[in-house]
Structure formats: structure tokens, C-alpha cells
Amino acid sequence: MRLFLSLPVWVAVLAMVLEGPAPAQAAPEISSTLGSIPDKLKEFGNTLEDKARAAIESIKQSDIPAKTRNWFSETFNKVKEQLKTAFS
């Protein structure tokens, strides 16, 4: 019974393999592939630039840099006061 059921499956698979690639699956020519590389690189560069600019703008608009700067200033002043009182 198993052989009877698997035989049509093997015939279908063999027919698909022997048929070869469909026209849409044919490999593109090397010249067209090489010709499109500069356009793809330019598109990648533009996308990367846009994402980098957006990230920088979001960092500029956030309050993280100001909070970090204030924390460092406060910590530095505390350390400076402690050193001043320790060595006075």
C-alpha cells in the first residue's frame, strides 16, 4: 500500500525536476546584474544616511545628553568637595 501511494508522488517530483527551471527562475545575465550594483549601493547609502540622521535627531531631541551632562557635573562637584574637605 505504501509503495502504491508513494509512486505517484515520485512520478510528480521526477516530472518537476526534469522540466527544468521556469522562465522566471532563469538566472539573470551578469551584465544586467553588474549594471544594477551602483544603483543598489546608492539606494543602500541613502537609506543608511536617512536612518543615521533620524537616529541623531532623536538623540538630540531627547533629554539623555542633558541628564548625563548634569549627572557628571554633580558627581564631579561632589568628588571635588570631598577632596577639598579631606585635604584641608
UniProtKB/Swiss-Prot annotation:
It is found in: Secreted. Inhibitor of lipoprotein binding to the low density lipoprotein (LDL) receptor, LDL receptor-related protein, and very low density lipoprotein (VLDL) receptor. Associates with high density lipoproteins (HDL) and the triacylglycerol-rich lipoproteins in the plasma and makes up about 10% of the protein of the VLDL and 2% of that of HDL. Appears to interfere directly with fatty acid uptake and is also the major plasma inhibitor of cholesteryl ester transfer protein (CETP). Binds free fatty acids and reduces their intracellular esterification. It comes from the Eukaryota. InterPro entries: ApoC-1_sf (IPR043081), ApoC-I (IPR006781). Its main location: secreted. Residues 1-26 form the signal peptide. Belongs to the apolipoprotein C1 family. It comes from Ursus maritimus (Polar bear). GO terms for molecular function: fatty acid binding; phospholipase inhibitor activity. This is Apolipoprotein C-I. GO terms for cellular component: endoplasmic reticulum; high-density lipoprotein particle; very-low-density lipoprotein particle. One of its GO terms (biological process) is negative regulation of cholesterol transport. Keywords: Lipid transport, Secreted, Signal, Transport, VLDL.
